[in-house]
UniProtKB/Swiss-Prot annotation:
This is Protein yellow. Glycans are attached at residues 144, 215. The gene is y. It is found in: Secreted. It comes from Drosophila melanogaster (Fruit fly). Keywords: Developmental protein, Glycoprotein, Secreted, Signal.
Amino acid sequence: MFQDKGWILVTLITLVTPSWAAYKLQERYSWSQLDFAFPNTRLKDQALASGDYIPQNALPVGVEHFGNRLFVTVPRWRDGIPATLTYINMDRSLTGSPELIPYPDWRSNTAGDCANSITTAYRIKVDECGRLWVLDTGTVGIGNTTTNPCPYAVNVFDLTTDTRIRRYELPGVDTNPNTFIANIAVDIGKNCDDAYAYFADELGYGLIAYSWELNKSWRFSAHSYFFPDPLRGDFNVAGINFQWGEEGIFGMSLSPIRSDGYRTLYFSPLASHRQFAVSTRILRDETRTEDSYHDFVALDERGPNSHTTSRVMSDDGIELFNLIDQNAVGCWHSSMPYSPQFHGIVDRDDVGLVFPADVKIDENKNVWVLSDRMPVFLLSDLDYSDTNFRIYTAPLATLIENTVCDLRNNAYGPPNTVSIPKQAVLPMGPPLYTKQYRPVLPQKPQTSWASSPPPPSRTYLPANSGNVVSSISVSTNSVGPAGVEVPKAYIFNQHNGINYETSGPHLFPTHQPAQPGGQDGGLKTYVNARQSGWWHHQHQG
């Protein structure tokens, strides 16, 4: 009888567990410290003995997915980083702590070999034409230890042949003595030659545009929106208080192509809680670098504790962004006003998501998040007996489900209030991508994690699959009689265990207290719900 009551009690507890306890992001890879795929043990031992490889000095900061490869960047902030641009062969390493393979090879990761190699890479981007865009900062060190053996250079690789097809050095007029560029956004227009890249100069306070077709770049400088907010320079991450008050424009995302044939670039300074926007019609026009001040638009603030370094937008207008103060990933549907009540939290974790450094959406609408505990690495000491670096993944549809970003749960919703100055609508050409830059994108298997045979030499892409990529159906927006109505998803969250802060006008989900019984507490607490992985649950037996 008592056993029956206990079973009933457990059942009731399970039923009333709030939705925030069910992690959506699932851990795919994790490391205590990074390891690299040296050609053999002898060379690895030599690198360790010489100081060319110091495992404790390596920190991953960027991630990108294409086919069966997951790219990871490791900047040369300290000595002993053997490669800065690397990847994981996902066919050979389904999960665990795989060695990082230099891309495209070891020779191309030689520090200081400016014309032939990449010295330091941060954020990278794969475009829909099968090209990998990498900005080499040419730097070694960080802060006061920084040296510049090489100039800033854009490197573009063809992922079907694993060869570099373009290297472009930024001219001196596009940089200044304070320049530090870590972020990149890539804008593909009518075809693969109609491509532009945008670079955020975080400490030089500028935005640089590069045209693939013209092989030329130009700089937008001194706009006040590129500068840090003097009231937002205080940070608290993992129990560490620090000040990054000089950090300007950093995170960027691009909207889908609008009716006028252009996208909207959204951006935020790191020391800021506010988002800004500008049409790529302005950025693509070199003649507008000096007279475009009023073409930039200021949006609302996200709310307290909402610094962000990484953002990405899906092709149906869903923006994801990291919230480094909250150990969380947030969302916003760009058809809604940029107001805090329309911002959601898709996942949060005070252990696994300490500093979610990079967020990406791949060609199959799967989300990838890299967390690296960066402030602990820079300002304190990492515990190398603990897991420090993690890569998570989940379908975009799963992440936004039952949040304000899922318009399937919204009865009302006004159109987007981001007002870009109107221009005459230009006719759009068909999206005809040239064959040499648009390979067929393979679809990841959804029913089995069985290893595929080793790929042939120099070809790491899996065989083409006929799987159909599922899309997120989005209902059309309607405006309620009173104007802005509260979405159903917002009410759903309130009635399913997600509490909201009410300090001021900002409404963000608040983190629930940790349940008793955790192991050691703090960063040493293990996140068993994540480490199990949805692929293990779905494919046992």
